A protein has these predicted regions:
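Catalytic phosphate/metal-binding cores of nucleic-acid and nucleotide-processing enzymes, i.e., regions
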Residues: 86
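N-terminal segment of the canonical double-stranded RNA-binding domain
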Residues: 2-83, 91, 99-103
């Protein structure tokens, strides 16, 4: 994931925001408003909190995200930083939203 110099969100996240008709986000408050508007909920956990007896990478993160009634959970990828997990969760949720909207329109 390539992080922009301007803000917290990756280029991939900002590109999909543009495709969805939003401006790229400059801060967490803007993103929170977009997530709330689209009924997206994201939770980030330390891997060892979710899978305490696993051989997972220590101090890594996992995400759980929902978009409406659809649930996304990342069981196989471990993100080394909170920021990586957060961007991955947002990207997956917004990608799903984009696919849903384009399926209805196309």
């Amino acid at each position: 994931m390539k992080k922009t110099n301007k803000n917290y969100y990756t280029d991939e996240v900002n590109n999909i925001l543009i495709d969805l008709g939003y401006n790229p986000c400059q801060n967490k408050e803007e993103m929170d408003d977009i997530l709330k508007e689209n009924n997206i909920k994201i939770k980030i956990f330390k891997t060892e909190e979710v899978l305490p007896n696993s051989a997972k990478i220590p101090n890594s993160y996992m995400y759980f995200a929902t978009c409406g009634e659809d649930d996304f959970s990342e069981d196989f990828t471990e993100y080394i930083t909170f920021c990586e997990a957060y961007n991955a969760a947002i990207l997956e949720s917004l990608s799903y939203l984009w696919l849903t909207k384009n399926r209805k329109n196309g």
